[in-house]
Amino acid sequence: MSNGTAVMGKINNKKTHIRCRRCGHHTYNVRTKRCSHCGFPAPRIRSYRWAKAK
């Protein structure tokens, strides 16, 4: 039982996101190994209709 809020205080000096090597945005999560902008390393680029401008 150590994956809650108490653990977050121990990782406050580390980087959560680094630059993604596919899209170039600063959205690659180091812990989950996934880019929140393009979905890397998934083979398809992440895109949703609600995210596009109307």
Curated annotation (Swiss-Prot):
Keywords: Metal-binding, Ribonucleoprotein, Ribosomal protein, RNA-binding, rRNA-binding, Zinc, Zinc-finger
Cofactor comment text: Binds 1 zinc ion per subunit.
Highest taxon in the source lineage: Archaea
Gene: rpl37e
Organism: Thermoplasma acidophilum (strain ATCC 25905 / DSM 1728 / JCM 9062 / NBRC 15155 / AMRC-C165)
Binding site for Zn(2+): C20, C23, C35, C38
GO biological process: translation
Coiled-coil residues: none
GO CC annotation: cytosolic large ribosomal subunit
Family matches, as Pfam families: Ribosomal_L37e
Required co-factors: Zn(2+)
Residue ranges crossing the lipid bilayer per the database entry: none
Family the entry assigns: Belongs to the eukaryotic ribosomal protein eL37 family.
GO molecular function: rRNA binding; structural constituent of ribosome; zinc ion binding
ZnF C4-type: positions: 20-38
Protein name, as recorded: Large ribosomal subunit protein eL37
Role noted for this protein: Binds to the 23S rRNA.
